[in-house]
Curated annotation (Swiss-Prot):
It catalyses: a quinone + NADH + 5 H(+)(in) = a quinol + NAD(+) + 4 H(+)(out). The chain crosses the membrane at residues 3-23, 28-48, 62-82. NCBIfam families: PRK05715.1-2, PRK05715.1-3. Its EC number is 7.1.1.-. It comes from Cutibacterium acnes (strain DSM 16379 / KPA171202) (Propionibacterium acnes). This is NADH-quinone oxidoreductase subunit K. One of its GO terms (biological process) is ATP synthesis coupled electron transport. One of its GO terms (cellular component) is plasma membrane. PANTHER family: NADH DEHYDROGENASE SUBUNIT 4L-RELATED, NADH-UBIQUINONE OXIDOREDUCTASE SUBUNIT ND4L. Belongs to the complex I subunit 4L family. One of its GO terms (molecular function) is NADH:ubiquinone reductase (non-electrogenic) activity.
Amino acid sequence: MNPNDYLVLSAILFAIGIVGFLTRRNALVAFMSVELMLNAANLALVTFAHVHGSLDGQVGAFFVMIVAAAEVVVGLAIIVTIFRSRRTTSVDDTNLLKF
């Protein structure tokens, strides 16, 4: 495949992630949409690194994956805690200022 194809795929994945984040009111779906956007950014970084013959993009993608893994741990812990106390993962139904 041509590197442009990978960049187009990255842009499409990022757009799907943005649409999913902005239109869905479920916290899990919004969380997965953010992860999809991070993976699209990783694909673009690796593609640029391959085109330029450098490892900088791959190293950047590696650090993005590390941050994404930490985000998954913290984000899912927060979502599970909210679900246990509120019995819903809807963003609209959850008001954290009121106990």
